Amino acid sequence: MLVTIRPSPCGIGGVIAAPPSKSMAHRAVLCAALAVGRSHITHLEFSKDISATLSAAAQLCAAVDTGADDAAVQGLGHFLPLTAPVDCCESGSTLRFLIPIASLTGQPVTFTGRGRLMERPQSVYETLYREQNLRFEQSPAGLTVEGALTPGDYRLAGNVSSQFISGLLFALPLLPGDSQLHLIPPVESRSYIDMTRAVQAAFGVHSRWLDATTLLLPGGQQYHPCDYNVEGDYSQAAFPAVLGAVCGGVTITGLAPDTLQGDAAILDILRRCGAVFTREGDSVTFAKAHLHGVDIDLADCPDLGPVLMVLGLLCEGTTVIRNAERLRLKESDRIAAMEAELRACGGVLESDGGTITVHGCAERLHAPAAPLHGHNDHRVVMSLAVLAAAAGLPLTVDDAEAIQKSWPGFFADAAPLGVEVEDA
């Protein structure tokens, strides 16, 4: 899908609602599926990722009935016999959350996926499974696991994706004995770990930090059904937030002020860049401001990386983004992808491992003659849309359908802000 994105002749400004948090929705769906009884999850966006988790839940242990923006999940209290692989589409969260849960089913479980999903590293789980003499077979065609995890002590690196830690958090409390997760410092993305724990607590399963690097997971617990409302998503709100910080006149609604979402850091980052905004309840309104580059640590908020690279181009001075290594292992190599596309627009930036240096150069940005590549990556496409609107460039972008992965309504929702999108 090839589209051209440009700002409206009337300028940028308006109100946009943050879509439901994809991270929280994944967690709520799985907790509901593992419960015995009916849970009602409200404020859902049926992106490809969330649809993959809902389908997997229905295949494994739940009856799922979806509405326009909600889902009733009836946990069956037992696992169903599998007759086909579990298709995780391109969702890393779906796959990594479900691998430990699969160990509870008493049967071999094969996972399949699309895009780069089966190329993404799973060595954390592979090591744990091999240590317990369990089956773990990964190939480009799929991943098969078999055998039951045992309660006990688990040691794993704290600077890997928190999805591995969350996957163990889902499954281990259901085992008959206590378990401890010993995280080798540094512990990154702690906010995502605590988000998992908070959603679990809403469904009656509890864990606690014994110290800064050790989690106690009491065994013999049971998930209980509940009604759960999903918060607005700060990682997605980052796109209109950067647009608002540059252009002004943008209000984002649905952003809980007391959130556990690590990507809420976008507001602090923008404030440090000189952004001017006010908060009233769950709404944040931006005024136009002169922005300057800052030093940014992505360790706890890696999903912000692509749009922060765009922000850096539109700030005065230099922006340095550190601890961005994990961007190379997403739906695309996001560092390489964004470097290529931003340079095509006249951007000046370079990377060294996990450090990205972006030089403010708004005055030299231009629309290239050839289309930009979306790299089949939703965050790359949405970041390029922000660049087009904020810099006043008509940019043609391919792979625009990649937004279906996380925010299917992104282009339609951004239209009232003055972001025009047409088929190219």
Segments and roles (model prediction):
Residues 1-424:
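Short, structured segments at the rim of ligand-binding sites
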